[in-house]
Amino acid sequence: MRTRRRTAALAATLALAAAWAGSANATEKPEELVVQKMPPWHPHEIYIVDISMPSMTDGRIYVYDADAKKLLGQIDGGFGPGFAIAPDRKASVVATTYFSRGSHSTRTDVVEIIDNTTLDHAGEIVIPAKHAQHVPSPYNTAFSADGKRLYVANITPAASVTVIDAVSKKVLSEIDTAACVLAYPGDNDRFTALCESGKALTVTLDANGKEAKRTMSDAFIDVDKDPAFVNASRYKGDYLFTTYGGNVRSADFSGDKPAFGKPWSLLTDAERAEGWRPGGMQQTAVQAKQNRYYVLMHKGTDGSHKDPGTQVWVYDLKSKQRVARWDLTQQKVEPLVSIQVSEDDKPLFYGLTATSDLVVMDARTGALQHVEKQIGNTSSLLVNP
């Protein structure tokens, strides 16, 4: 009898062990990894470029949904990334540098192509190892209006621009820009670079992407008395350049010879005497549908042009008059270093603080909507496709 009981108990134990083992094996089955697709694009999707000063070989681009108030994903940026979104929004590019030993040894510069539906790496183009490595600018890496050409600014310290066929994904040429920097796209076959003299160099390309013609303008910026910020804002085909002293001048780079508008002031004499002036890293933004110009302002002196803005001044670009003045401290918002505005019927205003907080406000009223804490290490450029 005891033998039967022991046998039955042993059988039950073995059956239980087998069942447990089967269950364990079932739960430990490797999970199949999938890449989720991005939600459909909408105008309140903002890209945030971070050069990542504490670890500069590991720059990042973050994608944020301001309606859902959540981070959608990130793109690897490498060292000193230049970033641009194709006009059709289907892809982005990152012009960057990699070293074979992480932070040193053999250098390779590439333009990486990103599929915007997944944020996956979709290919790369090896470019001359001259890509300019500096605080991100919208004109370090830029598409032509039709998206068929891509311009990448180089500094070695000699200045040049690499011209790329974005369709065939091939380098077409490298244009010596004679100490003039960055690449402001004009018509589909030309770009303009800014010169230290305050002049503008426009290069016209032939059908093969080679230089066909170049034109140097007269100085439109007084670099000694009133230098201008290089991060100009686009408005109806023109570029709006704002100076350290608070003046604005439009530049039309669409033709083979640049044309410039008459300067106008952001400040009254009394405001200028009080020390108000523009500042920050990405100091201005345009909302073309409403003809609005947003400018970061602070009280400062000569040399304070990179100081963050404690206020946002809003101008009507038709009348060139200020229509609003937002004091950020009244909403307990930290000073902003960079700004951007969405281009839609219910526009949002975006700002970055010095600690990489993303501030979202109603672009029509200035009412605070949300603050997303610390997106990145040293984020400084906002791109709204």
Feature annotation, model-predicted:
Residues 28-33, 68-75, 79-81, 120-132, ...:
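A short beta-strand motif characteristic of beta-propeller blades
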Residues 29-38, 77-88, 132-142, 177-188, ...:
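Repeated scaffold domains used in trafficking and secretory/extracellular systems
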Residues 40-53, 94-108, 295-309:
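Short, conserved, GDST-rich strand-edge loop motifs in beta-rich repeat architectures
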Residues 43-45, 88-91, 146-148, 188-190, ...:
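Short coil/turn segments that connect the beta-strands within blades of beta-propeller domains
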Residues 52-56, 98-103, 157-158, 198-200, ...:
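Short glycine/acidic-enriched loop and turn motifs that connect beta-strands
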Residues 65-68, 116-118, 165-169, 205-208, ...:
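Short loop/turn segments that connect beta-strands within beta-propeller blades
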Residues 119-162, 166-184:
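Asp-box/WD-like beta-propeller blade repeats and closely related beta-sheet repeat scaffolds
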Residues 276-321, 325-345:
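Loop/turn-rich, solvent-exposed surfaces of beta-rich toroidal or solenoidal domains
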